[in-house]
């Protein structure tokens, strides 16, 4: 059935009109908890029968995308969550007294479950897309419609017209994304994506420098005497006990290393790590590295023989014959390269805002350190020139020899070591075509422009068709988290482009408002699964069995069951389920793990434990490039040369093959490439003089928890502005202001603080967009202001690169 005809059919079963809850509806109560660990040694801390008060203990975990994975001990009475408490079972033999305690967001989980924003029933759209008007329908009708749409779109346009959007709202193993991908692969495949909104630039650029993406765990800082962090803010982005911040602090307690944090904001990490703050202009990190390199070279502070042993392209002696004679990084820094500009500390100071004397001093400090741990967060790479920032920071430890030795890193952000919990098998996607995840709106609006050499399409020379059937599950990137939301609204509102949008969600998010079919899935406190520690658990890794702490309310369902029903309408239920329920898949995964780790308890015991097992990475696993440093020939990197490639011939070739927009470059060296929207663009800054960068607030994880008002009371969303800039605009803290540029206007309070560099403003990302009658985003979403124009190499999101003006509302 065509989508328009289906939307206009009369429903005979429960055909009440369901008005959407207003975005950001109030939740008025709060409940604080603290959370630790459970292990196999503490199996006695399993849920027990009801106590004298009729309360039962159940176990779950916070599954959002903060990088941690914190266990939640949920107290239930009469099938209702009454509070969340610390999980007090632990084994000091593994991590000492360390307990994985959730942050204030995880502690507010029950308010998400009982939020007035919850989607209760399957619904179809009535009225225009984005109006938020829906009609309740049955599950049978909803799943039958999806099955019919999969068939219709496949027959009319081909499977490339079916797209499953990037999402990170819930990291399940046997439902959520794996369940949907299993269904789509089973039914013929779908248009895939590559990269993520978090790491597009660093994930794309790193292979050209290092090959594989690896980094030393923060435990290595126990052996360091100096720590230099570019835009890394663990105290806010990884603030729970399940994250890396605990590891960092313990390592610093051991080493007493000096910490330098380079960031436009004086972050909480500067405070908690007792660090020196070097405020820097956004987008200019590569210029800082070049200025440091100039001092290293001219003051003979580096060992050139060592650099040439492990690197390609530092000087002319290691350049390939295909490169120009003066194409080395040393030529670039000293001004004997093509641009003829010496990258002196004075040159770098004019760009970065860091005084030349401090740049020289920093170079000397890094060069003289016994073991310097150099690391970058993901914020610096989320810029229009992010790939160059990534490669420049990776070059710094290569130049100074601070890699592959205890207490060092290679410049990368270190992923955690996973425990190894399997995912639901998804099968193989017959469709090999993949697009950069940030360019799905282009694949809807202008598919004819989506080619391998213009838009980074992989697996094919170009797209054959636009996206016609769109799945958006547990994610808000359909609107809220995507750049330039006003542009996105216009594309989604045009029903002649993407014909059907299916949203699977817990809450009526801004993205959910644009659904044609809206399906309610279980929250993680209503779900069951076996899950892994997440990507930012550091050297800690563990496994958690999560239970249905309460019965799924209303008509919400597991995505595994939803997909099984869709498969059933297509005659594929048995192939989809293989005769197993979701719980049986989790049990099977556990048995697979237990075969390798026979000390684990029986599943009947383990599934009641919460945290079942916990492990810690070895010293060898925690140190990046150790084998390479010991013997580069015997243990080469996975780059073409087997070495650290400061000059990348692969990038030089790509720059020749690709067609780039005017003014954009893909250099073979980690050069500083000015961003269009930076303080260096005098034409734009005459109109919009402030650089605006986003940051991860403690009040919500991306857009998850953004509708829990008690968190806003604890951590309000405010735009940070320096007193100098505030005084020029006659602003004081608490004033409601308009932050604006050509892409839109956002209204929110301002915070006047010396913790932000003059000329720079900062706004937390993740607030739910909500336009008033004048088109002003009174929800406070930074993406009303951010650009959709992608970065040159990764075609990634440049959402921290913006120019704006601020005035009183």
Predicted features and spans:
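Glycine-rich phosphate/diphosphate-binding loops that line cofactor/substrate pockets in enzymes
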Residues: 143-162, 217-227, 339-340, 360-373, ...
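A glycine-rich phosphate-binding loop feature that marks nucleotide/adenosyl-phosphate handling sites
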Residues: 309-312, 366, 410-420, 579-592
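N-terminal export/assembly segments and adjacent metallocofactor-ligating motifs
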Residues: 2-301, 473, 727, 771-809
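Long, well-ordered, tryptophan-enriched scaffold segments
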Residues: 265-369
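Extended redox/cofactor-interaction regions of prokaryotic respiratory oxidoreductases
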Residues: 2-5, 177-262, 287, 395-514, ...
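Conserved short loop/turn motifs at secondary-structure junctions
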Residues: 165-172, 347-351, 377-384, 415-417, ...
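Long, contiguous, secondary-structure-rich segments that constitute the structural scaffold
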Residues: 549, 555-609, 701-705, 709-720, ...
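Glycine/threonine-rich phosphate-binding loop and adjacent beta-strand/alpha-helix elements that clamp
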Residues: 525-552, 562, 567-569
């Amino acid at each position: 059935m065509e989508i328009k005809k289906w939307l206009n059919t009369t429903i005979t079963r429960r055909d009440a009109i369901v008005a959407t809850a207003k975005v950001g509806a109030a939740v008025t109560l709060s409940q604080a908890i603290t959370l630790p660990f459970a292990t196999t040694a503490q199996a006695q801390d399993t849920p027990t029968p009801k106590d004298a008060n009729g309360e039962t203990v159940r176990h779950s975990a916070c599954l959002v995308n903060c990088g941690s994975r914190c266990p939640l001990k949920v107290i239930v009475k009469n099938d209702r969550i009454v509070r969340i408490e610390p999980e007090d079972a632990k084994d000091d033999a593994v991590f000492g007294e360390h307990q994985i305690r959730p942050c204030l967001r995880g502690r507010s989980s029950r308010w998400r479950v009982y939020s007035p924003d919850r989607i209760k029933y399957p619904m179809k759209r009535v009225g225009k897309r984005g109006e938020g008007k829906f009609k309740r329908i049955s599950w049978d009708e909803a799943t039958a419609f999806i099955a019919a749409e999969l068939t219709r779109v496949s027959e009319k346009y081909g499977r490339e017209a079916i797209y499953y959007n990037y999402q990170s709202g819930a990291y399940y193993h046997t439902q959520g994304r794996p369940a949907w991908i299993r269904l789509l692969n089973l039914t013929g495949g779908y248009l895939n994506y590559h990269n993520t909104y978090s790491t597009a630039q660093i994930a794309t650029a790193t292979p050209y420098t290092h090959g594989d993406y690896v980094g030393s765990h923060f435990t290595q800082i126990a052996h360091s005497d100096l720590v230099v962090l570019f835009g890394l803010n663990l105290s806010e982005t990884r603030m729970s006990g399940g994250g890396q911040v605990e590891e960092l602090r313990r390592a610093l307690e051991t080493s007493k290393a000096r910490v330098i944090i380079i960031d436009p904001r004086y972050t909480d990490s500067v405070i908690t790590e007792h660090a020196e703050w070097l405020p820097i202009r956004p987008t200019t990190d590569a210029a800082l590295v070049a200025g440091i390199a100039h001092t290293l070279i001219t003051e003979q502070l580096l060992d050139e023989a060592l650099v040439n042993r492990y690197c390609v392209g530092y000087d002319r002696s290691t350049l390939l014959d295909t490169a120009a004679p003066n194409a080395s990084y040393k030529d670039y820094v000293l001004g004997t390269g093509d641009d003829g500009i010496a990258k002196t500390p004075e040159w770098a100071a004019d760009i970065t805002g860091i005084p030349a004397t401090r740049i020289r001093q920093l170079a000397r400090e890094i060069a003289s350190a016994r073991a310097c741990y150099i690391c970058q967060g993901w914020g610096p790479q989320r810029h229009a020139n992010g790939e160059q920032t990534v490669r420049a920071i990776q070059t710094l430890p290569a130049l100074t020899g601070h890699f592959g030795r205890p207490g060092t890193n290679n410049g990368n952000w270190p992923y955690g070591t996973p425990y190894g919990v399997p995912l639901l098998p998804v099968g193989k996607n017959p469709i090999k075509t993949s697009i950069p995840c940030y360019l799905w709106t282009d694949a809807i609006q202008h598919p004819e422009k989506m080619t391998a050499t213009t838009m980074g399409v992989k697996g094919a020379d170009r797209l054959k068709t636009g996206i016609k059937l769109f799945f958006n599950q547990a994610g808000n990137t359909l609107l809220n988290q995507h750049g330039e939301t006003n542009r996105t609204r216009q594309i989604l509102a045009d029903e002649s482009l993407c014909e059907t949008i299916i949203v699977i969600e817990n809450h009526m998010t801004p993205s959910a408002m644009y659904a044609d079919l809206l399906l309610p899935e279980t929250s993680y406190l209503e779900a069951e699964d076996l899950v892994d520690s997440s990507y930012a658990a550091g050297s800690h890794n563990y496994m958690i069995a999560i239970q249905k702490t309460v019965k799924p309310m209303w008509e919400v369902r597991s995505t595994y069951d939803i997909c099984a029903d869709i498969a059933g309408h297509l005659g594929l239920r048995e192939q989809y389920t293989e005769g197993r329920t979701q719980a049986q898949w989790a049990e099977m995964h556990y048995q697979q793990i237990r075969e390798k780790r026979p000390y684990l308890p029986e599943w009947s015991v383990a599934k009641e434990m919460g945290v079942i097992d916990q492990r810690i990475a070895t010293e060898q696993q925690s140190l990046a490039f150790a084998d390479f440093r010991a013997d580069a020939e015997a243990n080469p990197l996975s780059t073409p040369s087997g070495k650290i490639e400061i000059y990348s011939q692969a990038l030089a070739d790509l720059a020749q093959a690709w067609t780039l927009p005017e003014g954009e470059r893909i250099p073979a060296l980690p050069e500083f490439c000015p961003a269009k929207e930076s303080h260096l663009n005098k034409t734009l800054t005459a109109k919009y003089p402030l650089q605006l960068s986003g940051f991860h607030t403690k009040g919500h994880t991306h857009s998850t928890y953004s509708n829990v008002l008690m968190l806003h009371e604890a951590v309000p969303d405010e735009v940070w502005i320096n007193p100098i800039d505030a005084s020029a605009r006659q602003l004081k803290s608490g004033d409601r202001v308009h932050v604006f540029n050509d892409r839109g206007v956002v209204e929110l309070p301002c915070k006047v603080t010396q913790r932000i560099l003059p000329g720079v403003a900062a706004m937390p990302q993740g607030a739910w967009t909500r336009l008033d009658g004048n088109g002003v985003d009174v929800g406070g979403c930074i993406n009303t202001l951010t650009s959709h124009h992608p970065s040159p190499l990764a075609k990634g999101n440049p959402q921290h690169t913006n120019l704006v003006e601020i005035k009183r509302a």
